[in-house]
Amino acid sequence: MIRNQANKPGRAKAATAARKSPLTKSAAKPAAASGAGAKLGKGVIAVALPSFRRERALLKQGIWPVAGCDEAGRGPLAGPVVAAAVILDPNRIPKGLDDSKRLSAEQREALFDKICKTSAFAVAYASPTRIDRDNILRASLWALSRAVRALPEAPKHVFVDGRDRIDVDCNCEAVIGGDGLVMSIAAASIVAKVTRDRLMCALAQDCPGYGFEQHKGYAVPEHLAALDRLGPSVHHRSLFAPVVAARRKHQPWTDVPEPDLFAEVTVVTSTEISLEA
């Protein structure tokens, strides 16, 4: 083996260069364990987990309860925007809370059940009709406000994900990227996401053929193809561009009243759900 390498100077030089390469050196060492104090190599992005620091600071000042709120479903072509507000119990915070987008469906479902058992929370919907009437941003902010107001106990401070504050009867603090920074917002993001995903699966039974149970109303190729083939359903947001194009193709579009499933406010405490028409 040594004789063959010596007879091929090009290969020997390559082997020597590889031994001297910093990339080879770093690859030879196992990666440091993740977590606090771990040293990360070049090109590795450290992802911070949400913390309870902001909520705990307010609690020490006597400001409690504190709620976090977030929404799911701004981007889809169909279904409601779902907003959630959560008041975590400082002594019973579920382990593993994170931005819902960084969790698998199985992780979200498991955490949703834990949040239901340990926290006070409320959910509000902005229906496709309201989205068409008010625009998606205003409808989302409206739903967030309604979710906070529907909490079983009025919060004294609210953290909301994003740039915009909402209309509530207490201090409201907007936190950009809050679902990845503030634990109560992360919990709200999970509640909103799981609730909306379940609703879209229910809509798939009400309107078969669109694949709502798979894509949850987002503009994936399969959804666009079904929309082009079948035309819009009552659950589609009629002013979103792909829906407008499909409606023009499938004239006339029958105007069907919205189902009771999309009552404007859903109050959720513990594991009980009641729809208010």
From Swiss-Prot:
Catalysed reactions, as listed in the record: Endonucleolytic cleavage to 5'-phosphomonoester
Subcellular location: Cytoplasm
Gene Ontology cellular component list: cytoplasm; ribonuclease H2 complex
The enzyme's E.C. designation: 3.1.26.4
Keywords: Cytoplasm, Endonuclease, Hydrolase, Manganese, Metal-binding, Nuclease
Pfam family, one: RNase_HII
Boundaries of every RNase H type-2 domain copy: 64-252
Superkingdom: Bacteria
Biased composition (Low complexity): 20-32
Cofactor(s) demanded: Mn(2+); Mg(2+)
Residues reported to bind a divalent metal cation: 70-71, 161
CDD domains for the chain: RNase_HII_bacteria_HII_like
Region Disordered: start-end pairs: 1-32
GO molecular function: manganese ion binding; RNA binding; RNA-DNA hybrid ribonuclease activity
Cofactor note text: Manganese or magnesium. Binds 1 divalent metal ion per monomer in the absence of substrate. May bind a second metal ion after substrate binding.
UniProt-listed SUPFAM superfamilies: Ribonuclease H-like
PANTHER family in the record: RIBONUCLEASE H2 SUBUNIT A, RIBONUCLEASE HII
Family the UniProt entry places it in: Belongs to the RNase HII family.
NCBIfam families: PRK00015.1-3
Record function comment: Endonuclease that specifically degrades the RNA of RNA-DNA hybrids.
Name this protein carries in UniProt: Ribonuclease HII
Species annotation: Bradyrhizobium sp. (strain ORS 278)
Lineage start: Bacteria, Pseudomonadati, Pseudomonadota, Alphaproteobacteria, Hyphomicrobiales
